[in-house]
Amino acid sequence: MWTGWWLWPLVAVCTADQFRDNAVRLMQSTPVIDGHNDLPWQLLKRFNNQLQDPRANLTSLNGTHTNIPKLKAGFVGAQFWSAYTPCDTQNKDSVKRTLEQIDVIQRMCQLYPETFLCVTDSAGIQQAFQEGKVASLVGVEGGHSIDSSLGVLRALYHLGMRYLTLTHSCNTPWADNWLVDTGEDEAQSQGLSSFGQSVVKEMNRLGVIIDLAHVSVATMEAALQLSKAPVIFSHSSAYSVCRHRRNVPDHVLQLVKQTGSLVMVNFYNDYVSCKAEANLSQVADHLDYIKKVAGAGAVGFGGDYDGVSRLPSGLEDVSKYPDLVAELLRRQWTEEEVRGALAENLLRVFKAVEQASDHKQAPGEEPIPLGQLEASCRTNYGYSGAPSLHLQPGTLLASLVTLLLSLCLL
């Protein structure tokens, strides 16, 4: 009897090791696709995006949640890198700043070709898996980055953007952010304005994943109901587990289930436990809850590494993913469910977005009304001279007659 008692700790250790061994085995063939990492923002803050700076060497970078050895230890096989610029750039230099962050992501791939493979589609992710590299994709974090322009949206797509978060923690002129739900911001669009609906439709047409992290509940509902393709929450958790407005409420999780969409769980302590402290088990609680409400196909990982100041014990950096997967296995997740959360759910959503795209369809052209824009740092070219599509026929004809007279054609 006493001999058995002394063996209990050994049995527990062996069992724990078995779960982690199984996690590693699974991740060797199905590495994790993480929905959101802010390493590019750290490269801007620390080194002004100068990757040749010896201190910025990603094989030995210190003081960040992410570097190349940590990515390899964590079996990260694909990463949506955040091209983020803060809300105070809105109506100023947000487009320039976004372009610079896309550029630094692309230069990461050029400087470390043995580690990173910049890709723009689901097939590229699978190619990177086969080559043992980290598929690197661009996620633009905040609708203010397109400066309320469908033309800029299209240009960012052509530069590699494959998801756009409709807002950051600020309203755009066409979509509301999560602070509306706390009362700290006032609703401007009641979810999505008419132009916001045009943005969603153009993203569907192009094949850009719609990301609803950071948006208000009304914006979540509007986008989920309007989009022809599944959407993602690239770094959000479950509101019923932690009642923080950055998390996803149950009725929206039902819409996620109905639309085949995806919630990629955020690891930030404040969203995990609603406290300054959190642990790995509490992150698993969010994964369990989303699986329970929306189904195993609705679960993914969006750690928000290098974008947050506090992380759970046991998930201190990107190398810790196998420990979280081991916890899911301990909680009797099936291997199929784990592979889904690791990668297959995101690949399914990405493929559905690609299939719903239609580049033969005419692109959206109607601009946002000038009156909805803050005018202090912008010109009004196009608005003052171009006839509106909403003019009455008689008014439009009069405008054409005036134009033809000026050209001496009448």
Curated annotation (Swiss-Prot):
Activation/inhibition comment: Inhibited by L-penicillamine. Inhibited by cilastatin.
Gene3D superfamilies: Metal-dependent hydrolases
Positions with a binding annotation for substrate: H168, R246, D304
An MF annotation (GO) of this entry: GPI anchor binding
Protein name as it appears in the record: Dipeptidase 1
Lipid tethering residues (GPI-anchor amidated serine): S384
EC number: 3.4.13.19, 3.5.2.6
Name of the gene encoding the protein in the UniProt record: DPEP1
Main location group: membrane
GO-annotated biological processes: antibiotic metabolic process; cellular response to calcium ion; cellular response to nitric oxide; glutathione catabolic process; homocysteine metabolic process; inflammatory response; leukotriene D4 catabolic process; leukotriene metabolic process
Keyword Ribonucleoprotein: no
Record's bilayer topology term: Lipid-anchor; GPI-anchor
SUPFAM superfamilies from the UniProt entry: Metallo-dependent hydrolases
A cellular component term, taken from the record's GO annotations: apical part of cell
Catalytic activity field: an L-aminoacyl-L-amino acid + H2O = 2 an L-alpha-amino acid; leukotriene D4 + H2O = leukotriene E4 + glycine; L-cystine-bis-glycine + 2 H2O = L-cystine + 2 glycine; a beta-lactam + H2O = a substituted beta-amino acid
Signal peptide feature range: 1-16
Subcellular location field: Apical cell membrane
Binding-site residues, Zn(2+) 1: H36, D38, E141
Keyword terms of this UniProt record: Cell membrane, Dipeptidase, Disulfide bond, Glycoprotein, GPI-anchor, Hydrolase, Lipid metabolism, Lipoprotein, Membrane, Metal-binding, Metalloprotease, Protease, Signal, Zinc
Binding of Zn(2+) 2, residues: E141, H214, H235
